[in-house]
Structures are given as structure tokens and as C-alpha cells.
């Protein structure tokens, strides 16, 4: 017999949603500010109402049953509609609203002014906190310290930064893909030589220390070819490497995403971009999908959904 919703405590659906997001009674209890015992009792009521276990224990936490998986999207949509309904009586620009982002620089800097204008237009009292993407950023998203991350991942099969290696709790959307190129000053002697792998490796390189590593997919590809570049300088950000590569009489080469042309135009750096001297299959391994990342619990959060859409529209021209 079909059950009536009037026989169900709707607060239990919030508990169910949080259990689906967190896959943990303890974590769901923490978010609800109740004890794990209270969440366990709520889960027991839900199991009785749906006549299904809903979750089973596994080494990775609570694993949803087929029925629970089938309800996930509908439950999320119901929660989003509920949030929108409850938000109606409130002012659309609440005081104290914060937007916290972790982003690769200069990726965010080229659109930061436009993004901040749109945020303040919609939420005049909002504050924006921007931090550089680093080794702790994914954990910061999980901890709830960051609303959205915006960073490049890697495509090399041996990379630790593959999209498929992201934690299960992280959702993402690729906004555009980029293949890095070599940046060198306009009067660099390499511009008077045949541009090939030997020329590329003849000069000293600037490396970016990315998530506590000085090497990345480029070095993996070189290793496969039995070659190695000379890293003369290691810096934390791409814009610093571009600045150093642009200095007069500097022989250093910087390898950075092609999107950096926007940054160079803004700052009028005297740099020339050359393609990495690899064949098509090797270039494919160097492709960088630039990706928005957020925690699954925020997938239907109206503020986060709006922020994601706004960033996506700003970077649409780079796709």
C-alpha cells in the first residue's frame, strides 16, 4: 500500500540527505548538531518507513542500497526546492554572506574583477575571501572552509592529479582544457634556433612547485623519452615564472598554460609563446582540464550553484 507523506516526519528527510552526502552517521550528526545516537534512531525510522535498509556498512563508510541510489536525485531536488521556499521571506542580500574560493593564480586573477562585480551586484553586503590553490585545498573544501576550488588537473596516466583520483566527496565540472606552452622573452636566443626538443632542453627551466612537488606531467613525458630538463629555479606560482622569464638577458624558460596570454596582455609582459616540442600523443598527456570543484553537500546549495554558474559564464570564452 502506498504510504502518505503525512505519516513521515519531514525532518527525517534532512537526516537522510546528510547521510547520503556524508556516508557517515557521526559526520551527519555533527552537521545536524545532534548525537550519533539520535541520527541512528532517525535512520531506524526511515528504514521502517521505506521498508529498506537504505544504507549498509562498508570499509568506506555507509554504502547506499539501490533504492537509496534511485532516490538520491529526487531527494536533492526536494531539498533544493525546500531551501528556496524557506529563503523567500528573507532579504535577497543577507549581511555576512561570505564567498570563499581557492584558485590557481593567475587563473582567477584574470577574471577576479568581473567576478567580484557580479557578486557585489547580487549580494552588496558580501565578503570575498580568495586563497591560492595548494596541497591542502581539497581538504579545505571537505572541511567546509572553501566553497569552490578552481584549478587545473592533469591527464598523464601516471599523474596523481587525475580527475579520477579526486575524493568521492568532491564534485567537479571541467570548464575548459588547455595544453601548456613555453614562454620566453622576445629576444631570447632560442628564437634564432630550430625549435625542437634539443633546443628546449638546452636552456634552464623555471618549475612550479605544485602541491608540494617540483615535477609534473611534463617531466613524466620527458622521462618516457629518456630525457630530463634542467630546473634552475622553482617558484610557487605561474605569474612569478612568467615575470622571471620576461626579465632582460634571462635565459630561463617558463612552461605555463596557454591561458596565461590573457595575464600577459593585462601586464604587457614581453613574452613569446612556443608550443612544447612533442608529438600529438605526448601533447595529449599534457592536457590540463581546468576544473571547478566543490563538496557534494553543496551540489544544491543556492549560493554555490549561483557562484558556479557565474564563474562558468565568465570563463566560457576560454572553452
UniProtKB/Swiss-Prot annotation:
Offer one Pfam family short name for this entry: HTH_1
Quote one Gene Ontology molecular function term: DNA binding
Q: Which residues form the HTH lysR-type domain?
A: 8-65
Which CDD domains would you find in this protein's record? PBP2_Nitroaromatics_like (cd08417)
Residue ranges forming the DNA-binding region read: 25-44
Q: Which UniProt keywords apply?
A: DNA-binding, Transcription, Transcription regulation
The record describes the protein's role as: Involved in anaerobic NO protection.
The protein here is known as HTH-type transcriptional regulator YidZ
Organism name:
Escherichia coli O157:H7
